[in-house]
Amino acid sequence: MALPPEKATELKQIIHEQLTRMDVHGKIREVLAESLREEFRTESQQLSEEDLMKALRQRGIVDEVMKELHFMEDRNTRELTSTPKPATHFIDKEPRTLKKTNVDPTRRYLHLQVLSGKAFLEHLQESDPLPGQACSTFTLCLHFRNQRFRSKPVPCACEPDFQDGFLLEVHKDSLGDGSRMADATTMLSICDPVQLVLLKTDTSGETSLVSSHFLEWRSVLGTEKGATSLVVELLGVGAECKVSVGILNVKLELYPLLNKTLSQEVINTQFTLERQKTAEKERLFLVYAKQWWREYLQIRPSHNSRLVKIFAQDENWVNRPVCSYIRPLRAGRLLDTPRQAARFVNVLGYERAPTVGGGGKQEQWCTLLAFLCRNKGDCEDHCNLLCSLLLGFGLDAYVCVGTKGRGQAHTWVMTCGTDGAITFWESLTGHRYVHKPINPDDPPMVEQPKPLYPYKTIGCVFNHKRFLANSQPLDAVEVCVFDLHDESRWKPMSEEAIKSVCSPGSIASLPPFPPLCGSLLDAATESNEIELQLRVLVLEHRKDLGLTTVWDDQLSYLLSPALASYEIERTTGISAGNEEFQDCIRRAVPDGHTFKGFPIHFVHRNARRAFATCLRSPFCDEIISCRGDQMRLAVRVRVYTYPEAACAVWIMFACKYRSVL
């Protein structure tokens, strides 16, 4: 297709400016001078244009120029196509824009490339997805020294097409060394592994944890070329932690190259010393914990039945002290208040650890990265994250282990105020309760406070520094006194013993804590998309009932203040804006007409699933299936985004119709 003369001139000008900026002419002169020198030295034939182009290609100059010349695709041509053609291959619905990274030449980098995947035998029988067909996908998440990365999703297969690279900065945290390029000896002392978390997303959008692996990267320090290839075997999680789920072919490269490499003997010696040091610290803590437990049982034999949890298993079934699951976590500018942090934790999905077969509850306290990447977990995962965030906000926070109704084991969070006030935080709902103890020795005529919280008994409390077991005569929460400094009521563990195995860097086996990531979701776009999908679903549902549907866009818009008010109340505990909402609805509904509204809250963005849930409510079904004179329907969706792709989705269905009775 020929360009108009003015467009051709403009294009030539752009190319000329780009070539001038890149100093391509200077590079050509250098290559030409070099080629002429080689020609005179070899006394060959006259240098041709082909020889010059060959030399330019060999030096990568042609490729460099072509990469710099970007031409934007005309979007208008795509917008004219009303019905897109079916895809002939898997399409990533969330395409990632390639961003240029500012590489600091004074820092050392580890380039981790995932070249391919093999032996994912669970997907051996799966055929390639048909054109336009939705398929399950794998996503790989990485964390290394406060840096987080996420691969593009690839279709699940026996040999998934993983082809991703991640540039990890290798640096020291200590002041003074942070700005200096790390040498081989310094990097050998950095025992932080690269944590890999593999997720599977099914066709309905549900995410499950496939594997959690800690990659030891320091073997690259002993290679002369600064690069090494590894075969990483991924094991399952929970009860399948001994079963291989697949293999990743990984390549590690250091940039820039090391001036001096280390011998493999030195590297192996360092690994051995770290393992021995870790094993000895863990052994000493275990010996201390056993002695502490014997002392606790000697106080009162009935203590044996209390929920005093010292160790917990992670997703790889590794036993770790519960205090190691907590660490003060600052959310930067992603969360502004402790209550907003509680709301964020509340909207993360709740899912009990999966089990194979029947029996009791499967225990699995996930590492923080696995919990955040999956965006759902058990109540212990929620409590550990909430406690860490509250500690980051400067509160004196603890995780409580006990029971709620019917003796079911449960965990929640407690904060102790400077004035002695005790507040309970329910991580799964975001609710807060003030604790006022009941004195069982008071006479019957004395009015006692009625507890509003659902908790029945408490066995222990802990955070990253302290672990205390309840040694009061009764373990009922309502009569407990939470004076944690009173050793006659709370038996403490040695803070030094806890620090030896739970403080950052104390042992090599301690998983590092990742930072929170901001949401990549666009709230307005998501709200519009879900609302349109719900309108289609309502239309189809009423059509099946033989009913016509007329939407009232103005009424739909007027529902927005109510949804905003509900979210503010969930976040702050303060109800606001209800008077204005009632006033505008009264004005929008004429005399003699009836208005009905049904709000509902979700923590997922699946419109079909949400609609099915709404229909199970008789009141909502009455609105959606409403019959009447001048009947108008309305629906409003509002998505509130939080860190880590978490979101609160508020939906409100409403109708107005003329009363004929």
Curated annotation (Swiss-Prot):
It is found in: Cytoplasm, Cytoskeleton, Microtubule organizing center, Centrosome; Cytoplasm, Cytoskeleton, Microtubule organizing center, Centrosome, Centriole. It comes from the Eukaryota. Coiled coil: none annotated. It holds the Pfam family CEPT76_peptidase. Keywords: Cytoplasm, Cytoskeleton. SUPFAM superfamilies: Cysteine proteinases (SSF54001). One of its GO terms (biological process) is regulation of centriole replication. GO terms for cellular component: centriole; centrosome; cytoplasm. Centrosomal protein involved in regulation of centriole duplication. Required to limit centriole duplication to once per cell cycle by preventing centriole reduplication. Belongs to the CEP76 family. This is Centrosomal protein of 76 kDa. The lineage of its organism: Eukaryota, Metazoa, Chordata, Craniata, Vertebrata. The gene is cep76.
